[in-house]
């Protein structure tokens, strides 16, 4: 008998990938994905612990599930409620205490054991908590991906965990030590995805450019070598990777940006702060100038490269002048996109124990607004610089308007255009006509093959007057 499975995914692309693999693990038990929790036989909340608000959202959602679970029980049925991901890893016991109707709690390294957990939950032997780091890698036990990809783009996990131990971050504690999948398995999974119609693969890892997987030739492969071998898969038109660390941006990977046309000219390279004292307090293990030099080398290899980044404002002890150093770095680098946040203390991290140095919320809010104004101006200028130029766009879904398709260009901008549905899944030249805050729109080019690039982000910053 078929059963309905509803998975709600919070946070990063790695969680999106993990949710798909959870569905693969549960498929042999008869579970099929459904789009809503109402009527589901199992609900999994695949959680994120990066920010406090994300964690509290989980408890709010668990409260909304309780009456659904009770209603099912009243009719003689059962809804299994499970919490997975990083909140589960960090707060397993607290989840069971605050939400005793939860049947299962499991971390991101143990979801391959879901069949055993489900059996225990069904037997009714109490809440199941499985947050230990297993000796065996989950990748050794996961089945091949089951359902066909939902579109022409797919995520592929190649690396997990982090050994950097930034003082504000919970990832080393929730995801564990760095682990790289063997290159042969990555290549085989990528080949299967391409055979199923995928044209673009994004390689995932908490610290993806720290990838050092066992190669089929007996040597250790870095991410650059992995990218080169992926590019040899016939039909794989685009390769991306995220998230990267400046210290792991080695010469081999930078050279791949210059020499592998399938590797897209867009990189997410977090820096967090532009001030050296704050970077040291964060345990980032690099200076602002180290970051500048990495960016310079990358742009020398690929002049049309665009960057996005992460920034934290109001880190404990941050002064006005130290925040000004971040604004200066942003102005110098120029970003096509960026993500910025107020510092949020995560329990158990060293930064949370920096008593007496916490920045007032009002100051954090002022700094965040100033930074976001600068970043928005840069993004607007970058998008505006694309107008009149032609981009190859991978159409991956229908747009909101009839007859409209939506896709992404090389620099990750969403691009809208009127186009027939037969172009879904194809890379098509689009002449950009209009730039919007978070997207572009244009017209499909017929009989023209121009791969012009937008101006470099530095120029975009100057045009924005920042």
Swiss-Prot record:
One Pfam assignment: TRAM
Q: Where is the MTTase N-terminal domain?
A: 3-123
What are the binding positions for [4Fe-4S] cluster 2 in this chain? 162, 166, 169
UniProt-listed Gene3D superfamilies: Methylthiotransferase, N-terminal domain (3.40.50.12160), tm_1862 like domain (3.80.30.20)
- What EC class does the entry list? transferase
How are cofactors bound according to the entry's free-text note? Binds 2 [4Fe-4S] clusters. One cluster is coordinated with 3 cysteines and an exchangeable S-adenosyl-L-methionine.
Where found?
Answer: Cytoplasm
Its biological function? Catalyzes the methylthiolation of N6-(dimethylallyl)adenosine (i(6)A), leading to the formation of 2-methylthio-N6-(dimethylallyl)adenosine (ms(2)i(6)A) at position 37 in tRNAs that read codons beginning with uridine.
Q: How does it assemble?
A: Monomer.
Q: Can you say what this protein is called? A: tRNA-2-methylthio-N(6)-dimethylallyladenosine synthase
Which gene carries the instructions for this protein? miaB
